[in-house]
From Swiss-Prot:
This is Transcription factor AZF1. It comes from Saccharomyces cerevisiae (strain ATCC 204508 / S288c). Transcription factor involved in the diauxic shift. In the presence of glucose, activates carbon and energy metabolism genes, and in te presence of glycerol-lactate, activates genes needed for cell wall maintenance. Binds to DNA elements with the sequence AAAAGAAA (A4GA3), a motif enriched in the promoters of AZF1-sensitive genes. Required for glucose induction of CLN3 transcription. Also required for proper FLO11 expression. May also function as a corepressor. As an intrinsically disordered protein, AZF1 is capable of forming the prion [AZF1+] that confers resistance to the drug radicicol in a gain-of-function manner but decreases the expression of AZF1's target genes. The gene is AZF1. It is found in: Nucleus; Cytoplasm, Cytosol. Residues 44-56, 138-158, 206-222, 245-275, 359-390, 771-782, 796-809, 856-868 have a biased composition (Low complexity).
Amino acid sequence: MPPPTAQFMGPTQAGQNESQNQSSGEAGEQNQEHGQGPTPILNQSQPASSQPQHQQQRNESISYYTNFNQPRYSTDASINSFLNISDNVPVTSTGGPSSGGAYSNLPRLSTSSTHQPPDLSQIGRGFSIVNNLFPQQQQLQNQHRQQQQQQQQQSHQQPPFKTPSFSTGLTGSSSQYQFLPRNDNTSQPPSKRNSVYLGPNDGPDFEFFSMQQSQQPQFQPSSRRESNSMRPPLLIPAATTKSQSNGTNNSGNMNTNADYESFFNTGTNNSNSNQNPYFLSSRNNSLKFNPEDFDFQFKRRNSFVRGTLDHSSQNAFIPESRLNSLSVNNKANGDPVADNVTNNMKGKSNEVDNDDGNDSSNNNNNNNNNNNNENNNDNNNDNNDNSINSATSTNIPNQEDHSLASTDTTSNSRKDLKEIEQRLRKHLNDEDNYSSAISRPLDKNDVIEGSEGLNKHIDESGMQPNIIKKRKKDDSTVYVKNEMPRTDPPMSKDNSTSAEGAAMANFSGKEPPIPDISSVSDDATNLIGATKVDQLMLIIQARKKGFTEKVNTTQDGDLLFNQTMDILPPKSELVGGVEKPKGTQNTRAVKKHECPYCHRLFSQATHLEVHVRSHIGYKPFVCDYCGKRFTQGGNLRTHERLHTGEKPYSCDICDKKFSRKGNLAAHLVTHQKLKPFVCKLENCNKTFTQLGNMKAHQNRFHKETLNALTAKLAEMNPSENIPLEERQLLEYFASIYKNSNRGIKGRGKGVGTKKSTISSPENHPASTILNPNTNANNAIANDSENNGNPEGNIDSSSNSNPGSHSMISPTQKDMGTLQSQFIQNNFNNSVNSSNPSNQPIINYNYTTLPHSRLGSSSSSNTNNNNSNFSVGAAPGVLMAPTTNNDFSFNLDQSNDNERSQQEQVRFKNINYKS
């Protein structure tokens, strides 16, 4: 291959080329103003005959070692789409230049009859004027054909995410340019060659990001230079169409939020007809997301992104917690900045419900708006403008029907929560007025009653809709979500040295308060006798305590009894829970903190503090989903897993997941093929892995048998004998269902919401209560003066000597001796006795401990004379004289007499890490 030869031009030709370069430079600058970038200059060669050139070979020149005339591989056809090369001269009718206009010097790729195909190898990166010093050689035809074939393939089959350039143009008119007039005179940088350009017809290529066809803009700039500059995302909470519709504020200055207002206000007509709300808030080449793109299944209802991208809303979404803080907290603190923000937000709608009693507050809000030069023509007496309009509210997006609760309701609820905390402190510190200091649960009256009584009902529309849907129908407590700030809870796990704990620690050795019936929530009471098994266990527990009165039943097997009868367990025992396993004295800590209600002992003051909450109904932890309250934070977290679907516990064998650790433990039994629970009703002998499954089985398939056993045991005469089989069956029920009727939510459909089926005789006038024992003991139990005594103790009017009736602890060693002495004596002739003081009252080892103010030393009650000794009992338990009729069957488990009193009191299973 011979070395290339360098060719030089004469002075005349050099001057022509210099003038041509200057003119082409001016044309390039002109094209640069129209968004085309620098236009490449082609050295169109003239015939050799018209322009004679002086050629001279210089082998020692640098051109001897330089390859200028070979094709440039850097401008390969694979990167042609990135180069600013036009395929043809634009021919448009809407302002584009014609073929003979100022843009006729653009290079062409297509062949014509008058011009030869240009050499594209010298156009690209590293373009230099040195290339024009040498004559061009003919380009190979095969390379040109290859470029044409590749361009045809690109025009017919474009990839979904293409890299278009100015050579391809818009989709549908790839061979034309569109030069549109500029709308502004601001100096902006030129467009980049490799920027992604999305035209209005590029929707099919970007189906995931494409918008609706009805919302396609009719106007689209030719490049990014025609759009406004990119600004960082900004949320404008107080933009209104009244004051900013023309893009100017009251002072006459340009409004900087006009672009963002046009982004959210799709229906407003701006002064500029070419302005499009979808493409003016940012650069035209950026990707826009439509709210329908996020309309998938498991989205959040109050999504922050969805509220921002929703074009139907009049403003950006404001988080509810932030909105509450602006409307309540900052307003109360008197912050002038917060007041201005609140007044701006209330320009079109206030956060106060439309009520006749709130006209003065609405007028004040309108006056504040007049001071801020907004809504100057508002009528102070127009309540419709002051009410919250769900269609035109500028504060809250209404696609999910969110609305704010009334400020009065929020303040009233917060006031009620403070009153509960004050009542708790007063209750724990006061020792004289026990009955007045008892706290009661938060009911509807507490939430509804305000300081002036303006609001007589709670507007359900002001509450969160998801709370209303998931709330139980029979729930007697109304809770409003996020009314109390979660930053300052009434009680927390770190508040171990609080005033409540210190006050409860001072209860040792003092008289505890008497818990009122109304002070305990009815949730635990409704669980008593919920099923047939529970009703049978209720009468078994009553007979176990020594209750011998006859109780009538209905045709359906429901129990009928008076409130004075001691069938129902005391309120202090309706705390639920499962007893912890027994331990030794060395492994368990000394329990020195005593509960003033049930006299249970705890090793730590914080344990006692949590335990007392269950007695007084104080539940500071609220579920944000359904409004249910809990006494412990751990129980709340476990409950919230039902809403969130979280299941952190998984089985190692089958990988099944559970939300509770106890459910996992019950599931592991199924893999071990163990079924410890056996149904003994009617010789069924069906085995079960869980007790709840057997209970549901018995309530469904052995309902008649349970009704027969309940009726027989309820109407049994003390003189009758119990057959051996029935006694064993009763002992079987008493052993496996020992935690029944203690306020624990059991298994089965509708157990948690079902009211107790036990009714009183007043509701059934046709039924009569047969009292075979009309002695003085029953007179004491049915005495009208004794009804006010929640403990059911002996009436003081029946005996002038209160010291003659003393109580014996159920954990004392001589309890078995007293029972044996009592049973061995013959009391057949004392049924009609008129001396109630001689009738013994025995406590059959029930769970609660005696009150210290009613008891005395048990050493004085060890007299063997039956007429001189009288023992105490559990609250309201009266023991009628019995005969030797085998009725005194033992349903209690064996107790270790060597254990101390502190060890025998066990507390429920509490998650103390909450």
